[in-house]
């Protein structure tokens, strides 16, 4: 059965929206930081491989420490850096392609996928902040009075409409308490 939201549930809606948006922003921020760390490690590894200070076996060992989404960031950055270095032989790039295929990606498609994910995360964060701003600007009391069935019924009385906000809230809470105890 479908029942109308209680007064408390209606008031909690704005808070829950904020919480959900902030949790989503936090999730994206963590993923972004981890991906950034993966790219930094890829840069360091590329320098080490180019100078001979690092062995190729270290690629998979380092990559194994990252979450799945960061492995792609790591490999895309590593391949980009290795291609830009002059003294890297073709066999190293070929080995990187094999590792890329092992994690389920190809070189060019992976770069597009990584870029697309970064763009999507940026747009999502922008939308989250825009939504939080709009939620903050919303007149929640006006919205509440518009959607609350209790308030709509009480508003039929001219004397109720003439009350201040605190008095109207007291009326609504009293009615909800009565309803809760009548069940």
Segment roles from a protein language model:
Residues 1:
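Active-site acidic catalytic loop and adjacent metal/ATP-binding pocket
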Residues 4-5, 162:
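Short, conserved sequence motifs enriched in acidic/basic residues, glycine, and aromatics
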Residues 5-54:
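Helix-rich C-terminal or lid/interface subdomains of diverse kinases
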Residues 43-182:
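Basic, amphipathic N-terminal segments
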């Amino acid at each position: 059965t479908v029942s109308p939201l209680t007064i408390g549930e209606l008031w909690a809606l704005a808070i829950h929206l904020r919480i959900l948006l902030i949790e989503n922003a936090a999730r994206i921020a963590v993923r972004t930081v981890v991906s950034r760390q993966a790219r930094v490690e890829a840069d360091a590894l590329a320098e080490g491989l180019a100078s001979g200070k690092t062995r190729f076996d270290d690629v998979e060992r380092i990559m194994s420490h990252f979450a799945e989404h960061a492995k792609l960031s790591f490999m895309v950055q590593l391949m980009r850096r290795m291609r830009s270095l002059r003294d890297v032989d073709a066999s190293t790039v070929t080995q990187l392609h094999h590792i890329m295929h092992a994690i389920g990606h190809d070189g060019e498609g992976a770069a597009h996928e990584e870029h697309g994910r970064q763009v999507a995360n940026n747009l999502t964060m922008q939308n989250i902040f825009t939504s939080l701003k709009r939620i903050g600007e919303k007149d929640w009391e006006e919205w509440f009075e518009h959607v609350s069935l209790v308030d709509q019924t009480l508003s039929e009385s001219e004397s109720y409409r003439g009350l201040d906000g605190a008095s109207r809230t007291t009326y609504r809470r009293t009615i909800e308490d009565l309803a809760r105890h009548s069940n």
